[in-house]
């Protein structure tokens, strides 16, 4: 049975909704009574999630970097579900490996999906949020607070979405639109499980403090993000201790540098890191779509 709280019968758009955090978030929001528009690659995955929800849904398969496709999707969402009052920009991809030998097209694709795609999502749906005095939640990452080696495109993109959200918030606040940032730590998704198959990435995560290297269940992360949507939060940290990393962010680069200097030479000598390509089933779906 759907909930009767502030999200009941409100339309919420979730990108990257076919799997992982996006799918879990769609389920949680629908459980609170929201109508859900699911956007992303993998039509079958989007439709499977949509069919599992207890409220009205609409699923749209698209490339999140395609402005025209997003404009068409926004029109379809209004037609089928009503004007959105919340948008969650969650879609993202990642790849790992040394920057010096990285594939320029693949590196650029990570930036395009994570940063440009988030901005394109906001652009397409901002007229709706202005009309409803709604809420835009940008899903960011621990990587927005502190960058790690071997993940340069992902870290750059997540730093970028944080800055974009701060800028957008200041721009639209006087119109009654709220903008929040979701800082998310390692989550148990296919993307992270795929990253752990690569020894250098796995060991670098292993050198983080115990709470920081733990994998958190997608449902737990989604519940906190759904709370943020419900309360129009300016920032949400998943888990809550991540707020401490935010407070200490100026001290993080020297710590990361010290660990990298000590460990990367050893790790690369033992097993030279190869480029991962786009990680996880979501990355494979992105590759398949952009090849066609």
PLM features per residue range, with description:
Residues 98-99, 103-111:
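Substrate-binding pocket helix/loop in short-chain dehydrogenase/reductase
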Residues 32-48:
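Conserved glycine-rich Rossmann-like NAD(P)H-binding loop of the short-chain dehydrogenase/reductase
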Residues 174-242:
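SDR active-site lid
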Residues 122, 157:
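Active-site helix of classical SDR
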Residues 18-19:
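Conserved glycine-rich cofactor-binding loop
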Residues 141:
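Residue(s) in the substrate-gating loop at a strand-loop-helix junction
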Residues 62-72, 104:
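The beta1-alpha1 cofactor-binding region of Rossmann-like NAD(H)/NADP(H)-dependent oxidoreductases
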């Amino acid at each position: 049975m759907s909930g009767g709280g502030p999200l009941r019968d409100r339309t919420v758009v979730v990108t990257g909704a076919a799997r992982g955090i996006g799918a879990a978030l769609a389920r949680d929001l629908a459980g609170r009574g929201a109508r859900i528009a699911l956007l992303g690659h993998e039509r079958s995955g989007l439709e499977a999630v949509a069919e599992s929800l207890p409220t009205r849904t609409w699923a749209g398969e698209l490339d999140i970097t395609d402005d025209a496709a997003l404009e068409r999707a926004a029109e379809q969402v209004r037609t089928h579900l009503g004007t959105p009052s919340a948008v969650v920009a969650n879609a993202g991809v990642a790849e790992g490996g040394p920057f010096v030998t990285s594939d320029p097209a693949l590196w650029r694709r990570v930036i395009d999906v994570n940063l440009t795609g988030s901005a394109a999502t906001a652009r397409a749906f901002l007229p709706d949020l202005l009309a409803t005095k709604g809420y835009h939640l940008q899903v960011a990452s621990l990587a927005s607070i502190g960058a790690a080696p071997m993940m340069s495109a992902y870290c750059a993109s997540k730093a970028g979405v944080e800055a974009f959200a701060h800028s957008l918030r200041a721009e639209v606040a006087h119109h009654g639109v709220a903008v929040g940032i979701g800082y998310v730590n390692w989550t148990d998704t296919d993307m992270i499980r795929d990253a752990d198959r690569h020894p250098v990435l796995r060991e670098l995560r292993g050198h983080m403090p115990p709470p920081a290297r733990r994998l958190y269940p997608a449902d737990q992360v989604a519940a906190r993000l759904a709370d943020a949507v419900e309360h129009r939060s300016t920032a949400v940290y998943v888990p809550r201790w991540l707020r401490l990393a935010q407070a200490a962010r100026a001290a993080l680069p020297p710590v990361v540098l010290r660990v990298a200097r000590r460990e990367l030479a050893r790790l690369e000598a033992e097993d030279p890191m190869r480029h991962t390509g786009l990680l996880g089933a979501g990355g494979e779906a992105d590759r398949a779509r952009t090849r066609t």
